[in-house]
Amino acid sequence: MAHKKGVGSSRNGRDSNPKYLGVKLFGGQAIEAGNIIIRQRGTQFHAGDGVGLGRDHTLFALVNGTVEFSIKGPKKRRTVNVIPA
């Protein structure tokens, strides 16, 4: 007959790695083509003029210029543009 009690396993003890999401360059800042403006999950911000949308919804500059944020349309969508330098 065993004299040790059965030991239960903990349901905790794991954590995901940080994803470093968020706005990387703010309005009025200079940017070069290819630089990341925002890393996001889903389209919290939408791509405007001079901005590309990556596979993981990352927004990046297509041209050199200045970052500009705006709110457009009846749905009040937050849009990011790059004004060419």
UniProtKB/Swiss-Prot annotation:
<dbReference type="GO" id="GO:0006412">
    <property type="term" value="P:translation"/>
</dbReference>
<dbReference type="InterPro" id="IPR018261">
    <property type="entry name" value="Ribosomal_bL27_CS"/>
</dbReference>
<comment type="similarity">
    <text>Belongs to the bacterial ribosomal protein bL27 family.</text>
</comment>
<dbReference type="GO" id="GO:0022625">
    <property type="term" value="C:cytosolic large ribosomal subunit"/>
</dbReference>
<dbReference type="GO" id="GO:0003735">
    <property type="term" value="F:structural constituent of ribosome"/>
</dbReference>
<keyword id="KW-0689">Ribosomal protein</keyword>
<keyword id="KW-0687">Ribonucleoprotein</keyword>
<dbReference type="InterPro" id="IPR001684">
    <property type="entry name" value="Ribosomal_bL27"/>
</dbReference>
<dbReference type="Pfam" id="PF01016">
    <property type="entry name" value="Ribosomal_L27"/>
</dbReference>
<protein>
    <recommendedName>
        <fullName>Large ribosomal subunit protein bL27</fullName>
    </recommendedName>
</protein>
